[in-house]
Regions:
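Cofactor-cradling patches in redox/metallo enzymes
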Residues: 216
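Glycine-rich active-site/cofactor-binding loop and its immediate structural neighborhood
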Residues: 165
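Structural scaffold elements adjacent to functional motifs in cytosolic proteins
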Residues: 169-171
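A conserved helix-loop-strand patch within extracytoplasmic ligand-binding domains
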Residues: 146, 150-154, 161-162
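Rhodanese-like catalytic fold shared by cysteine-dependent sulfurtransferases
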Residues: 28-149, 174-213, 221-343
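N-terminal amphipathic/basic-hydrophobic helices that include classical n-h-c signal peptides
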Residues: 1-26
């Protein structure tokens, strides 16, 4: 759940961070050598980026970005709010580079960096450029990451920080994300939505005692906004992982890593591990929780209908609806396969 609505809206309200490599210059992007395992396939580029910056011309920006994406066959999600931009887009490299160039022509985004990964098929079905109240929904008025945030910690320095006994390490992600992986020793608030975090922090963090707090999330946006909240309520020593879990998994060798498990991502890949290798997870179509091969062996797992997480959360009528949807999905898939083999 996210802000009382279905988790499918995470595509609109959470960061959708994906991935691999910060690129600061267009020429760097153009010269990048693909690491895809299938050399017969020209991979699509997936670019994830965000920036907290004051924006007042949202409608104009929306039109410009949407037009540029459509012109260049780029799909994905772009969220715009007065506090900034949050996006993940995917398409041919040339198209993605043109979109990023167009955005960076705006002086407010001239220093925009992005994280880059690859996909052998388009991970997004549509292009959505949306205007929002917040680019990541915390729901607390007055929190402004453009004015005040915590201290960035590079992935190479993260292990040393979170290993210190007086540092309170907090995973700011939702429970369906933390369930498949987190940092060793981190506290999981058990969130259904990011907007629940402020009330949890108010109960657990006593600003008067001036604790040392380290926060992390998938790609950096949620923990950055979380540190802004803690700084606003008076906590002085607040840190957050620069580039998020994904940058850590990319840069820190597995043998040195304090990460345990996999990292949930908000696209059809579902999860990645060390080195940003694809992990063996898929989503339950009923509840959207990530499922491992072991989860799929559960007696409660029915493809497209239920899993061990949701089997007792839906009615008989809902399950019947899911079953019909699954039937239609399989029928459409078989027709597509039949068409493919007939060509």
């Amino acid at each position: 759940m996210l802000d009382g609505v279905t988790r499918q809206q995470c595509y609109f309200d959470n960061e959708i961070q994906r991935v691999a490599k910060n690129t600061t210059l267009t020429m760097d992007a153009l010269k990048h050598v693909s690491k895809t395992k299938d050399k017969t396939v020209d991979p699509l580029v997936v670019a994830a980026f965000y920036k907290f910056v004051q924006l007042n011309d949202l409608a104009s920006l929306q039109d410009k970005i949407e037009s540029c994406c459509r012109e260049n066959n780029v799909f994905g999600i772009v969220l715009l709010a007065q506090e900034g931009i949050n996006s993940t887009i995917a398409g041919p490299r040339e198209g993605v580079v043109k979109v990023l160039d167009r955005i960076r022509q705006d002086s407010r985004f001239s220093d925009l960096q992005w994280k880059e990964s690859f996909a052998t098929k388009q991970p997004f079905r549509k292009l959505r450029v949306r205007l929002k109240k917040e680019i990541v929904t915390l729901g607390v008025p007055g929190v402004d990451p453009t004015e005040l945030v915590g201290t960035y910690v590079k992935p190479a320095d993260w292990n040393a920080l979170i290993s210190e006994p007086d540092v309170f390490v907090i995973d700011t992600r939702n429970n369906y994300e933390t369930e498949i992986g987190t940092f060793k020793g981190a506290v999981d608030p058990g969130l259904d939505s990011f907007s629940q975090l402020p009330s949890w922090l108010e109960k657990k963090i006593d600003a008067g005692k001036q604790p040392r707090v380290a926060m992390f999330c998938t790609g950096g946006i949620r923990c950055e906004k979380s540190t802004a909240f803690l700084k606003q309520v008076g906590v002085k020593e607040v840190y957050h992982l620069q580039g998020g879990i994904l940058k850590y998994l990319e840069e820190v060798p597995e043998e040195e890593s304090l990460w345990e498990g996999e990292c949930f991502v908000f696209d059809q890949r579902v999860a990645v591990g060390h080195g940003l290798e694809l992990a063996d997870y898929e989503l339950c179509r009923a509840c959207r929780f990530p499922l491992s091969p072991l989860d799929k062996q559960s007696e409660y797992f029915q493809e497209g209908i239920s899993c061990s997480k949701c089997h007792d959360q839906t009615s008989i009528e809902q399950k019947a609806g899911f079953a019909e949807r699954q039937k239609q999905f399989e029928l459409a898939k078989s027709r597509k396969e039949a068409f493919k083999h007939a060509k």
